[in-house]
Amino acid sequence: WTYTEYKHLREMPDIEIGQRVKMGEIIARAGTTGTTGGYYGAFGHSHLHLTAFFSPVSEYKSKRIFVPVKGEWLDPLALYKGGPLKSSELKALPAAQKSVKFAYKTATGKIVPEGAKVVWPFACKPK
C-alpha cells in the first residue's frame, strides 16, 4: 500500500483516506500556509509539502496525524523512479542510478511521457 499526504492546501479536499483517485485528478489546490508573513512577505507563496509512506498492510491510524500500520517513510522520489522504495536501498544505489525523471500532466490533460503510471502533483507546462 502506498499513501501520500499533502500539506499546505488551500482547503481540505472532499475525499476520504483510502479513496482511489485517478492519475492527474485535481483533489485540491496548493495554499500558502507555512509561508505567510516573515521572510516570504504578507502573502506567502503557494507550495506543496508531500509526504509518502508504504506498508504491506492496508490498516492505518488517523487522529491528529496519519500513521500506516507497519508503515515506513517513503522518499517521494522513489515513486517516480519505480523502486526500490526503502530509503536505505535508495541510498545504497550507485550515483548513476539515482537520477529521477518526472512524469507530469499538462494543464490540457496530456500525460508526459505517455504511459506513465505516476505524475508530479502539479500541472506543468512542457518546455
Segment roles from a protein language model:
Residues 2-24:
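Short histidine-centered loop motifs in beta-beta connectors
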Residues 3, 9, 36-41, 64-68:
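Short, flexible coil/linker segments at or flanking structured domains
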Residues 4-7, 28-29, 49-51:
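Structural recognition of the beta-strand scaffold that forms the well-ordered cores
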Residues 8-11, 34, 52-54:
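A mature extracytoplasmic/lumenal domain signature
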Residues 14, 35-37, 57-60:
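Conserved protein kinase catalytic core
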Residues 17-19, 25-29, 52-54:
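Internal, well-ordered interaction modules that form the hydrophobic cores of assembly/scaffold domains
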Residues 25-45:
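Flexible, gly/ser-rich surface segments that form the specificity/activation loops bordering the active-site cleft
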Residues 43-127:
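Acidic, glycine-rich catalytic/binding loops that coordinate metals and/or anionic ligands
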